[in-house]
């Protein structure tokens, strides 16, 4: 078995020990709150990162044909560096949760991205709601000059879940709180 707490470019195709497992946790919580969820676990970055956004774009477009939505969450684990034990976490009640971080793409790289300001607004509002409910759950968001397929939705974002130093349990705990924030946000 693999330990989720690895560093560098460690990847596994074992869904029980990857960010896909964290996505399962988020999906289960959101379904419990009445959200309609499609959780795709296709490996787009294995065996290589090159071309992963092209491959994932095709997957998302196919999903959107039969399940139209504006909310698209692309969960990642932040790979801080190969020698880092950095584990951004926050204590919420008796729980230790991995901190989350939005990564929002823009049209700054020259690619068509008409929704980037709407996506940014969504992330800002969700982060504000999270700060009201669970201060420290989110780190400061990053805005980049790439679009990360976020042009496909009006509430599309990457959410980095912890880092290579966080445990799987901490990352899964974060999903409990993220799902509550999403539920409150939509009310």
List the predicted regions and their residue ranges.
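A short, glycine/acidic-enriched catalytic loop
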Residues: 80-115
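Envelope-exposed proteins and targeting segments
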Residues: 33-35, 69-71, 96-100, 153-157
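Second-shell loop/turn segments in exported
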Residues: 6-19, 42-54, 60-61, 108-117, ...
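Catalytic-core regions of hydrolytic enzymes
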Residues: 13-89
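Non-catalytic propeptide/linker segments at domain boundaries
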Residues: 1-5
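Active-site-adjacent substrate-binding region
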Residues: 115-142
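Extracytoplasmic/secreted envelope proteins and their assembly/folding machinery
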Residues: 23-27, 57-61, 120-127, 172-175, ...
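Active-site-adjacent mobile loop/cap segments within catalytic or ligand-binding domains
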Residues: 138-187
């Amino acid at each position: 078995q693999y330990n989720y707490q690895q560093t560098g470019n460690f990847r596994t195709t074992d869904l029980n020990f990857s960010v896909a497992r964290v996505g399962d946790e988020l999906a289960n919580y959101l379904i419990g709150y009445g959200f309609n969820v499609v959780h795709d676990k296709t490996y787009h970055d294995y065996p290589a990162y090159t071309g992963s956004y092209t491959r994932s774009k095709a997957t998302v477009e196919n999903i959107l044909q039969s399940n139209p939505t504006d909310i698209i969450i692309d969960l990642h684990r932040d790979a801080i560096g190969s020698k880092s034990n950095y584990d951004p976490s926050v204590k919420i009640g008796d729980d230790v949760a991995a901190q989350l971080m939005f990564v929002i793409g823009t049209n700054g790289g020259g690619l068509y991205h008409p929704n980037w300001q709407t996506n940014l607004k969504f992330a800002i509002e969700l982060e504000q709601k999270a700060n009201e409910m669970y201060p420290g759950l989110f780190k400061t968001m990053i805005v980049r000059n790439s679009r990360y397929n976020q042009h496909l939705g009006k509430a599309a974002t990457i959410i980095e879940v912890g880092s290579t130093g966080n445990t799987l349990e901490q990352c899964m705990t974060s999903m409990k709180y993220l799902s509550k924030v999403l539920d409150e946000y939509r009310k």
